[in-house]
Design a protein with these regions (language model features):
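C-terminal binding/interaction regions
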Residues: 78-81, 91-151
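Conserved mixed alpha/beta catalytic, RNA-binding, or beta-rich assembly cores of soluble enzyme
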Residues: 7-86, 108, 113-122, 126
Length: 151
């Protein structure tokens, strides 16, 4: 994970990771000199960025607390260069590796659990068996649209 791409040095990576925990945010995205902090739960921020600001993800370094397969798909589709996760699921790690996204993590788990810790993350379940980021994106889109309708 020590590549120096897009002007993102190891020191800048460390700053993004430190900020992730200091600010108690969901993710920090570093792209060149631009560093932005996000607070939405789940994949909402990554999904919005992919749809509305894809340039921020392209070639970026992303520090994220939890990366499941759905988040990994969004990062791969966005052209993310590298991700550092506190916790990553094995399916997410496999998908990122298949899509040449550099990956570092503290803990790799079989799957991501839901917010109430009573089962699996619903998006992790929806992405089971899917092979491509595009297939996962369709599930993420459906999930987000369903959540909006149900309010």
């Amino acid at each position: 994970m020590a590549r120096d791409t897009n002007g993102i040095t190891p020191e800048l990576r460390r700053q993004a990771i430190d900020r992730l925990f200091a600010e108690r945010c969901s993710c920090v995205i570093r792209n060149g000199s631009d560093m932005r902090v996000f607070y939405e739960r789940g994949v909402k921020d990554l999904y919005r960025l992919l749809k509305e600001e894809p340039g921020l993800l392209r070639g970026a370094f992303v520090a994220d607390k939890v990366v499941g397969k759905a988040a990994a798909a969004l990062l791969a589709l966005g052209g993310d260069e590298e991700v550092s996760a506190d916790v990553i699921s094995r399916p997410a790690l496999d998908l990122l590796e298949k899509n040449a996204v550099g990956t570092g993590y503290r803990l790799c788990v079989p799957h991501i659990v839901n917010r109430t810790h009573t089962g699996r993350c619903p998006l992790e379940t929806r992405c089971d068996g899917l092979q491509t980021p595009e297939e996962c994106l369709a599930q993420v889109t459906d999930f987000i649209e369903t959540m909006k309708r149900e309010g």
